[in-house]
Amino acid sequence: MTDIHNHKILILDFGSQYTQLIARRVREVDVFCEIFPHDVAADFIKNYQAKGIILSGGPESVYDSDVKAPEIVFELGVPVLGICYGMQTMVMQHGGEVKGADQSEFGKAIINILNSTNNIFSNMEHEQLVWMSHSDKVTQTGEHFEIIASSTNAPVAAVAHKNKPFFGVQFHPETTHTENGKQIIENFVVNICGCDTLWNIENIIENDIKEIKQKVGTDKVILGLSGGVDSSVVAAILHQAIGDQLTCIFVDTGLLRLNEDDQVMQVFAEHMDINVIRINAKNRFLDALRGICDPEQKRKIIGKLFVDIFDEEAAKIENAKWLAQGTIYSDVIESAGNNQSKAHVIKSHHNVGGLPKEMKLKLLEPLRELFKDEVRKLGLGLGLPYNMLYRHPFPGPGLGVRILGEIKKEYVETLQKADAIFTEELYKHNLYHDVSQAFGVFLPVKSVGVVGDQRRYEYVIALRAVVSIDFMTATWANLPYDFLSLVSNRIVNEVKQVSRVVYDVTGKPPGTIEWE
């Protein structure tokens, strides 16, 4: 079996908003990498045995901060790439000088490559469009570095060490705005560091299956299956690895999208022949939510009841030793970021509410090394349907936070029908994948309408569609008026409990993506 971790890159994080992008770009050229805090222990860096090290950008100013790259980085003899702040601290630690720029530079810029021989700019045109985001700049490179690229506002746009494989760029090759950023990353990782391209879906599947078999042996494994991307891919990889040793528990809350409960059973229980226990808990959730209007209270009730029901059912499965979860790499990084110590051991991220103490199950997280886009590709490689893997994000509490105020069975059914029409038309008009998220919201207010000669006094549905890269900010989707008119007409005509449809034109900020 191929050792997919044999050739790897270590990324030291100085707090840049783009650090995860660096990792994703490295993995896009089929090389494994991991992110750790910049102040991780020197022994850890030494023992990690990276083929190369990348120093990320960061929000600090080098000249008034004691945040520096560990000296061990420059003593190991492996190639180093400093990005933005990473370049500045590397140059400064080698006798160069960094000062505050007269003018901050944010946005696209043209750099001129002065030297592309055997470095990060190999086989690239002399003019390159890049993305700048900095307030400081290198003013003196010192005796060890030479300038290999410059721009109008950043005379030192990139540097190379005269004797060692150390490189720095003032811009951000990891962003899509840098036209040939992927080529720069590939030049560093593959050509300079000499990494073999082992990190691909076929190798990951082979590696994961072997690791799961070795770890689990003949034990039984329990998985909470929600129908979401992560738990679905975990179910598929575990089934390939251990077959009938896996039992999935699907808690049907009644708050899923239209027919989603049946679709989950169809894909996993019927087509893939996975052992799935379906728990019809619709009435329990409705009873628990009766009279509750506060959004936060609703979330807590739904989350606690879900875990309680899962625990009840899991306790009935004899000889189960493992609890599988869909923890992914961004969860792991987030957990590490919340840990203020320098420890490089990353704490577990329990995305199903944590391990119940009395169950004493060991945790199995087959996806913890993968980003979301890698999880989706893994799912395709395992034979899961494209539309299941590339659906829009869906909140954990489900429609519970898309029905404003109290949740009633009538409201759920009304929203399911309206939301399904919106989604169906987005697919029909090839708009679904042009937006990042789209859904309906049930408003518990009534509005007068006229259908035929009949006066109707029924509920209002709000349609929400946004475009976003990271979901931290979002713009409302500028869907065609004809399309919105069609969707509105269908909902009012086909869903008898709705008399009016409105479209949400609020960005984030000031609004949030979900209404509750």
Curated annotation (Swiss-Prot):
Q: Which residues bind ATP?
A: S226, G227, G228, V229, D230, S231, S232
- The Glutamine amidotransferase type-1 domain is annotated at 8-198
Q: One cellular component GO annotation, for this chain's record?
A: cytosol
**What interactions and quaternary structure are annotated?**
Homodimer.
Write the Enzyme Commission number(s) for this entry.
Answer: 6.3.5.2
Q: Where is the GMPS ATP-PPase domain?
A: 199-391
Q: What domain of life?
A: Bacteria
Q: Is Nucleotide-binding given among the entry's keywords?
A: yes
Q: Which reaction does it catalyse?
A: XMP + L-glutamine + ATP + H2O = GMP + L-glutamate + AMP + diphosphate + 2 H(+)
Q: What class of enzyme is it?
A: ligase
Any one GO MF term held by the record is:
GMP synthase activity
Q: Which UniProt keywords apply?
A: ATP-binding, Glutamine amidotransferase, GMP biosynthesis, Ligase, Nucleotide-binding, Purine biosynthesis
Q: What is this protein called?
A: GMP synthase [glutamine-hydrolyzing]
Species annotation: Francisella tularensis subsp. mediasiatica (strain FSC147)
What are the positions of the active site?
C84 (nucleophile), H172, E174
